[in-house]
Amino acid sequence: MRAALLYLRDSNFEPAAAQALATNPRFGALYETLAHYATITRRSHEAADFARRAVALQPRLWRAHLSLGMSLLRLGRMEEGRAAVEKSFAGDPFNVWAKNTLDLLDSMRDFRETRRGAFVIKADAKESDVLAPYAAELLEEAAAKLTAKYRFTPQGPVTVELFTNHGKYHKEVYTLP
């Protein structure tokens, strides 16, 4: 936890991590914990890197595979992310987060991507032709206003997913069975 505290303070956490690994060189949970804190502070690239380190140290740490998969999905690396989530679920078939994530990804197989400017809009193929142009216009308008207001431009592309069934999305992402 000391390494995580230092990480959250943007301090050098490596000496604390090295100390923990000196006690147990296969302590993947160290980097899985760092991945968790990177995730909740919206540092997906760092979360993925930490999760990879956790998996390298402790290959059967299934929650680290899930953390890696979720981070990769957030980064838009869908195939690699799905593979990591599948590996997590194969190792721990009782993990509801892994199961629900795989169900959600399955429900998105028929989605079509529309790229416009800094945005990637994903919607059901049956609705994409109708929704994507309106969504793109709204997103570009909102982005212009928010970029000016907050003086921040997100690194693109920004992915927006449109679901026809809000209840399914909500169930898959936010709840347990």
Predicted regions and their residues:
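Canonical tetratricopeptide repeat
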Residues: 1-2, 33, 67, 101
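Juxtacatalytic substrate-recognition/specificity segment
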Residues: 15, 111-177
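Canonical positions in the second alpha-helix
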Residues: 19-20, 53-54, 87-88
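Residue-level signature for tetratricopeptide repeat
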Residues: 5-6, 37, 71
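Helix-start (N-cap) detector for alpha-helical repeat units in TPR-like alpha-solenoids
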Residues: 28-29, 62-63, 96
